[in-house]
Amino acid sequence: MAKSIRSKWKRKMRAEKRKKNAPKELARLKNVLAKGSEVLMDDVKEIATVVPSKKINEKTDMDVDAPEGDSSKMDMELKRNKKNLRDQHGQYPVWLNQRQQKKLKSQCGKKKGKSKQAKKLAW
């Protein structure tokens, strides 16, 4: 779509306004951050301990390398029917939405029995 003259003019004026107000905005941001950092850090220190991100990353790396016996065991306990995705208690998985559940129910409801023989023509 073509850009109108009006929209070009508005865009140009907004850019000029940003240039004009940039120093004020920067000073205001610095002021807010200076005040906010003192107050927030004091509050956070009272509530919780501050831990550097490097330690947290190292900790998660160790957890990933460690064998996961409990979680894999739980996955094995749940036996799902591959055809209709139900588990042993008849529950659908959490990620399956209602529409898909309804569709699966209708597909499983149709039983494939012996097909009836077509009537033969009498000659």
Curated annotation (Swiss-Prot):
Just give the chief location class.
nucleus
Function per UniProt: Regulates dendritic and spine growth and synaptic transmission.
Gene from which this protein is expressed: llph
Q: Where is this region: Disordered?
A: 1-23, 55-123
Upper classification of the source organism reads:
Eukaryota, Metazoa, Chordata, Craniata, Vertebrata
The record's subcellular locations are: Nucleus, Nucleolus; Chromosome
The biological processes this protein is annotated with in GO are:
dendrite extension; positive regulation of dendritic spine development
The entry sums up its family as follows: Belongs to the learning-associated protein family.
Compositionally biased spans, kind Basic and acidic residues: 70-89
Q: What is this protein called?
A: Protein LLP homolog
GO MF annotation list: basal RNA polymerase II transcription machinery binding
Q: Which InterPro entries match?
A: LLPH-like
Q: Which GO terms describe its cellular component?
A: chromosome; nucleolus
The reply to whether Lipid metabolism figures as a keyword in the UniProt entry is no
- What Pfam families does the entry give? LLPH (PF10169)
